[in-house]
Amino acid sequence: MAPHKSDDVDAEAELASQLAADVAAAESSAATKAKASSASSSSTPAAERQPFSILDLSEPTRKAIDAMGFKTMTEVQARCIPPLMAGKDVLGAAQTGSGKTLSFLIPAIEMLHRLKFKPRNGTGAIIISPTRELALQIFGVAKELMAHHHQTFGIIMGGANRRAEADKLQKGVNLIVATPGRLLDHLQNTKGFVFSNLKALCIDEADRILEIGFEDEMRQIVKILPNDNRQSMLFSATQTTKVQDLARISLRPGPLYINVHADLAASTVSRLEQGYVVCESDRRFLLLFTFLKKNAGKKIIVFMSSCNSVKYHSDLLNFIDVPVLDLHGKQKQQKRTNTFFEYCNAPCGTLLCTDVAARGLDIPSVDWIIQFDPPDDPRDYIHRVGRTARAGNSGKSLLFLLPTELGFLRFLKVAKVPLNEYTFPSDKVANVQGQLEKLISKNYYLHQSARDGYRSYLQAYGSYSLKRIFDIHKLDLAKVAKAYGFSVPPKVNITIGTGLKTSASSSSGSGGKRKEVDVDGEGEDADGEINPKRQQSDRRAYYRKNHQNGGSKDHFRKSGANATGNKGGKQWSR
């Protein structure tokens, strides 16, 4: 967080957790790419868009917009910025990737400039974001927009150094980007945090904030913040009952409702080619492995349902020389930040993640979205695939479904999501099941990681709300276990209902369960720590065996090199 302009240059000062200098450099580069994507993503043809020059902007803001390379506004920007600059409250709904970040930042910054806010005046504008990564991204754009302004700005979020944040809040931060939990903490406990002069409150991705369990925090935040002459703006991709309730308590009566793209025939952009593949549980990893080998030069995001599943597949794929990055809610903040910006700046590569990366993030030039584990709701599907086909680019997505999950397609159809079925010849899928089971049985570290991933997959599956489609009783546990490298299902405990436990170790399904949720809305279910010495020993032993006997890692490397998948006879990797 940064109370003085000189402090705003480095992301590590803003994070107040002494992140490495290379992360700060990555943030600047990623923010530039993100804002370009945010500004240019729109269904409105460029020739029909209105220029930023028609807005009554201050010279510092105009210089910043010119330096950022923006000439025309997207539809959401053209419809939101003028009424917001006129002081109206706005309830906005728009497709993901429509460019709404500038829609709320420009009016907030102009307000601070017009009122000549200084550090001694405290905080005049607060932007609330559901996740740390999205908060970092918004902060990066704000930093460039405020490059020629004298007002101060900063970021406060979970995982950063709270004391350093408090010190800078006490010095005065005019514009704050924040996550809900840390913001409420400072509002309640930080002495000298001046927010009595607050003039603008923006709640971004409001539906996501509420979905991941911050409803109580948001109500407390709105209650604490002054509402006299406060302008509020609330952006949400979907207008749920909870979002409407939050809008009632946070917005002034009679807000302007702006719904961009409400009349479109599809909920996703036309440049996105979408498909699904029907695959039995025991073939899922083999197909994923084949796909990643075939598309090694592409930029791919793979969504999974739990932190432990992401961790296991990352451990396994990196071990067998399929390089991937991983991002999930159990990682420490520095690791999450490093990974996020590393992937943003990479020209190609694979990111395994939970839904922590599904909402709002502008990750440049993503070629493929793979939904290895289906989402719980069509809205989540739409936000996942929204990470590709941005800024006028094309993209592709692939949804993995079990035969018992085909009913989910009906929900996607109702949500105006067009999908084609993809097929793949079984003889083109890498047959590495034997090598996988041998590796998992002999490597203690991977065995433990696989067991945690298997258990978390079952727990997450039991937490689906669409239980008629995602019915844990219909899972063949023997086949699920094979996908995690087990010849026989391991015995694991999973939580059922409101706290009872059962063991799952047979080929029949287990009862449903309620997934515990952490601050990012992801399952938290670790059994314990792995002995790092045992891990290193296993790795050394395995490498020795490979070099001496041409072990199974070489087979993994060769398998899948020529594998293809077809959609109507065409290769996936066109």
UniProtKB/Swiss-Prot annotation:
The ranges of region (Disordered) come to 31-53, 500-574
Q: Could you tell me which InterPro entries the record lists for this protein?
A: DDX18/Has1_DEADc, DEAD/DEAH_box_helicase_dom, Helicase_ATP-bd, Helicase_C-like, P-loop_NTPase, RNA_helicase_DEAD_Q_motif, SPB4-like_CTE
| Single GO biological process annotation from the record | maturation of LSU-rRNA from tricistronic rRNA transcript (SSU-rRNA, 5.8S rRNA, LSU-rRNA)
Q: What class of enzyme is it?
A: hydrolase
| Keyword Protein transport recorded | no
Q: Name the chemical reaction catalysed here.
A: ATP + H2O = ADP + phosphate + H(+)
- What this protein is called in its record is ATP-dependent RNA helicase HAS1
Species:
Mycosarcoma maydis
Classification of source organism: Eukaryota, Fungi, Dikarya, Basidiomycota, Ustilaginomycotina
What gene name is given for the protein in this entry? HAS1
